[in-house]
Amino acid sequence: MLPSQSPAIFTVSRLNQTVRLLLEHEMGQVWISGEISNFTQPASGHWYFTLKDDTAQVRCAMFRNSNRRVTFRPQHGQQVLVRANITLYEPRGDYQIIVESMQPAGEGLLQQKYEQLKAKLQAECLFDQQYKKPLPSPAHCVGVITSKTGAALHDILHVLKRRDPSLPVIIYPTSVQGDDAPGQIVRAIELANQRNECDVLIVGRGGGSLEDLWSFNDERVARAIFASRIPVVSAVGHETDVTIADFVADLRAPTPSAAAEVVSRNQQELLRQVQSTRQRLEMAMDYYLANRTRRFTQIHHRLQQQHPQLRLARQQTMLERLQKRMSFALENQLKRTGQQQQRLTQRLNQQNPQPKIHRAQTRIQQLEYRLAETLRVQLSATRERFGNAVTHLEAVSPLSTLARGYSVTTATDGNVLKKVKQVKAGEMLTTRLEDGWIESEVKNIQPVKKSRKKVH
């Protein structure tokens, strides 16, 4: 039987570290609602507090770089919604949460719903650029979906009247705030698509709080805007207000007035462009006419100076002159060619190459014979001289001397030894005999005294 596996043994440090990693990796980031208590802010600028409900509580920390983005001062007993990461403070083993953002409970819940819906629709690709429809340029009719009593409608109509008074506008009045507003906005969008009277829609309202603008964060409104066959320009609130409708719409305008600017043409600017184009066209026509008139005058003058009858007469005279010159030149050329042919025929008859060829062949044969004889004599003499040189060379060759029993000894530097003083004891010598070399070492040096000859 296999021995049972021993249970893992943790140190306290390892246990706390393992629990912290499990909390951070498994739980991730969460939204938590609760009541603030025990709120403190030390000199470091960090916030420390407890978040609790009726039956439980948890310690919280919000570091300075995160709490600087909070737009209110947390109070004891205040209900809030926080976005936080769950962790464990390892030195004490305290379970706590690290808060990243904080909002009052009312706005916080709405913001949470906003983020959840935004993530959902984004996952469905409703915000993708590939689904955005281009706006008509220019628009022939504008539809406006907003409150008939709101300031947004007044701003839109004022801008359209100023920029393009002739542009038709169709108003689809609807409530933009309250529980019934999302349904009314959806029906207005669907009605505009059914009637198909306009080629662009402005959907929006004036500014307000998050609750006031909440109708444009409704999922039904977002899907109706996405499904609209008519391009939709969202114009909700002020430039800092961003709603779900802005992401789904084909174009977001920061304000209702800006939306009117986008869908309309500036009539005054168009008039200035037309006037400028007209002036350029008139200048171009004047220049063209003046240029054509000047060209016509030049051509007319040239026609007067070069009447066809006069030109034909001059051309006829020139043609006759050229014909005479050509006939004279042709006759002279034929005469010169005939004379040259006669001279060449005479020279050819006088200089028949056959005799020259015969003499040249005879001369070549003679030269060949003389060359062969000269080479034979020179080769014989050269052979004789070579034999004499070989005989002489063999007579004076050192090898012949070696063959008679003599030898040649050289030092290590290759010099031939003539006297004993050229070497020292212990040096290596090389001796050449008739049939090879001998390597030897100098053991002893004994000079031979020369005997003096007696003079009688």
From Swiss-Prot:
One Pfam family it belongs to: tRNA_anti_2
Listed GO MF terms: exodeoxyribonuclease VII activity; nucleic acid binding
Enzyme Commission number(s) of this protein: 3.1.11.6
Subcellular location: Cytoplasm
Keyword annotations from UniProtKB, A to Z: Cytoplasm, Exonuclease, Hydrolase, Nuclease
Class of the enzyme per the UniProt entry, highest EC level: hydrolase
Reaction(s) this enzyme catalyzes, per UniProt: Exonucleolytic cleavage in either 5'- to 3'- or 3'- to 5'-direction to yield nucleoside 5'-phosphates
Source species, domain of life: Bacteria
GO CC annotation: cytoplasm; exodeoxyribonuclease VII complex
GO biological process: DNA catabolic process
Family recorded in the similarity comment: Belongs to the XseA family.
The protein's role, per its UniProt record: Bidirectionally degrades single-stranded DNA into large acid-insoluble oligonucleotides, which are then degraded further into small acid-soluble oligonucleotides.
Assembly description: Heterooligomer composed of large and small subunits.
Protein name, UniProt field: Exodeoxyribonuclease 7 large subunit
Gene behind this protein: xseA
